[in-house]
Amino acid sequence: MTRQDASTPAPSGARIIDGAALAQRIREDVARRVQALAAKGVRPGLAVVLVGDDPASQVYVRNKVAACEKAGLYSIKEQYPADMTEAELLARIDTLNRDPAIHGILVQLPLPPHMSSHKVIEAIAAEKDVDGFHISNAGLLMTGQPLFRPCTPYGVMKMLEAEGVPLRGAEAVIVGASNIVGKPMAMLLLQAGATITICNSKTRDLAAQTRRADVLVVATGKPGMIDGSMIKPGAVVIDVGINRGADGKLCGDVDFASAREVAGAITPVPGGVGPMTIAMLLVNTVEAAERTAG
């Protein structure tokens, strides 16, 4: 796998979609909205809850808290031991639900095995569910009336919009059917007028599906699962994956070296979707605060 930073030009002509640069512009807009709220006496607040000591989760949480502080949001990080009981976590979430200084609550996944992610997510007040995972928010998204859009799919849509990618009538293929990325991604693309195919681990002849895609979104957690032979010439390729390769370097679910020879545009790893996910978390938190401010 070849690491490709957003600042490095693609030698074969595939346009690099610079998620880091777009995320910076979004964070600057968030900072302006935070200042406008301050004039009303409101400071957007985000609580990030981490259970256990998973190294990757610690990095994600640290990045989210740092982004909040840089944009002027109030943020608190609560870290608990892996042996915390589910009841204790639910009680803490209930307290945060009732805290008027907190507009958004994020529980970092995955949780320890003895906890039900579904039960924990459902405990978060829907109006503070800035991840967009609560069943109420999933239903609103399904009907085209989202309160919060899940951060990663929301970020992908902003990238496609910024790149001027035509979605109406386009063939969009999503590899990965998770509740966090794949399913909400399908809903957002469908609402934009694309024709959707969702592939999962049971899909027969995956390459035949991906080669039809004008827009290909890959979110499997499997390094290099998609290579250039599986991509339609000129397609827009969005790599949601972030993995550690055998060499210890970050890599995506798409083999960048071969994909860039075929794609018309492609997101790098790192510097692509990751920064956008955090940027859209800030957007959702500010929107939650704006609703309370009236």
Curated annotation (Swiss-Prot):
GO biological process, alphabetically ordered: L-histidine biosynthetic process; methionine biosynthetic process; purine nucleotide biosynthetic process; tetrahydrofolate interconversion
Pathway assigned in UniProt: One-carbon metabolism; tetrahydrofolate interconversion
EC numbers, comma separated: 1.5.1.5, 3.5.4.9
Keywords in alphabetical order: Amino-acid biosynthesis, Histidine biosynthesis, Hydrolase, Methionine biosynthesis, Multifunctional enzyme, NADP, One-carbon metabolism, Oxidoreductase, Purine biosynthesis
Domain of life: Bacteria
Pfam family, one: THF_DHG_CYH_C
UniProt binding sites for NADP(+): 176-178, 201, 242
Reaction catalysis annotation: (6R)-5,10-methylene-5,6,7,8-tetrahydrofolate + NADP(+) = (6R)-5,10-methenyltetrahydrofolate + NADPH; (6R)-5,10-methenyltetrahydrofolate + H2O = (6R)-10-formyltetrahydrofolate + H(+)
Cellular compartments per GO CC: cytosol
A GO MF term: methenyltetrahydrofolate cyclohydrolase activity
InterPro entries: Aminoacid_DH-like_N_sf, NAD(P)-bd_dom_sf, THF_DH/CycHdrlase, THF_DH/CycHdrlase_cat_dom, THF_DH/CycHdrlase_CS, THF_DH/CycHdrlase_NAD-bd_dom
Subunit and partners: Homodimer.
Entry similarity comment: Belongs to the tetrahydrofolate dehydrogenase/cyclohydrolase family.
Function: Catalyzes the oxidation of 5,10-methylenetetrahydrofolate to 5,10-methenyltetrahydrofolate and then the hydrolysis of 5,10-methenyltetrahydrofolate to 10-formyltetrahydrofolate.
Protein's recorded name: Bifunctional protein FolD
Organism: Bordetella petrii (strain ATCC BAA-461 / DSM 12804 / CCUG 43448)
Gene: folD
